[in-house]
C-alpha cells in the first residue's frame, strides 16, 4: 500500500495528511479488491478505486462526500471514487471505461463527485456505452 501512498504524495491536496490518513482512506477499496493500480514500464503511474453503494450510502456521499467503511460494498449503485495518475491518463480512462462496461454492461449508470478543497461542486454521471469495450 505504500506505493499507492507515494503516488498520492504527488498531489498537494494530500500533503497535509499523514500516511496513516491516506492508508485509512484507501484501505476499504484495497480490502474489497475494488481498485486498480496502473503501470507504465513497471512503474506505478496511477490508481483507480470504486464503490458499490446502497441508496442510503449514496445519499450520504452526495451530501457529505464521505463513505463509511461498511458502505464500500453495500449496494448496487456504482461510484467511481477516484483516479489519480502522474501519466497515461488517457490509457487509464480507457481501461476504466472498458472495465466498467465489461463488469456492468451497456446502458448502466456510473456516478462520481467533483470536489475542490474538500467541497463538492458537481455531481456527475454517465451511462456505459458499447464503444467503450475493447476488441479482445
Give residue ranges: language-model regions:
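Short amphipathic alpha-helix that is part of the acyltransferase structural core
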Residues: 1-23
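Acyl-donor binding region in acyl/amide transferases
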Residues: 58-130
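A sequence-level detector of short linear motifs
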Residues: 46, 121-122, 134
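A short helix-loop-beta-strand connector motif used in the catalytic cores of GNAT acetyltransferases and
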Residues: 24-40, 52-56
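Glycine-rich phosphate/pyrophosphate-binding loop shared by adenosine-nucleotide-utilizing enzymes
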Residues: 42-48, 78
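Short alpha-helical interface patches
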Residues: 47-51, 55-62
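Mixed-charge, low-complexity intrinsically disordered regions
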Residues: 2-8, 126-136
Amino acid at each position: 500500500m505504500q506505493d499507492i501512498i507515494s503516488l498520492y504524495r504527488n498531489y498537494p491536496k494530500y500533503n497535509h495528511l499523514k500516511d496513516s490518513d491516506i492508508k485509512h482512506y484507501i484501505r476499504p477499496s484495497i480490502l474489497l479488491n475494488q481498485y486498480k493500480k496502473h503501470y507504465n514500464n513497471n512503474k506505478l503511474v496511477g490508481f483507480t478505486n470504486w464503490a458499490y453503494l446502497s441508496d442510503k450510502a449514496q445519499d450520504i456521499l452526495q451530501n457529505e462526500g464521505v463513505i463509511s467503511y461498511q458502505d464500500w460494498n453495500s449496494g448496487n449503485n456504482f461510484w467511481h471514487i477516484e483516479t489519480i495518475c502522474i501519466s497515461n491518463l488517457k490509457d487509464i480512462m480507457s481501461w476504466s471505461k472498458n472495465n466498467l462496461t465489461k463488469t456492468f454492461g451497456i446502458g448502466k449508470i456510473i456516478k462520481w463527485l467533483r470536489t475542490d478543497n474538500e467541497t463538492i461542486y458537481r455531481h456527475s454521471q454517465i451511462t456505459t456505452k458499447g464503444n467503450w469495450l475493447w476488441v479482445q
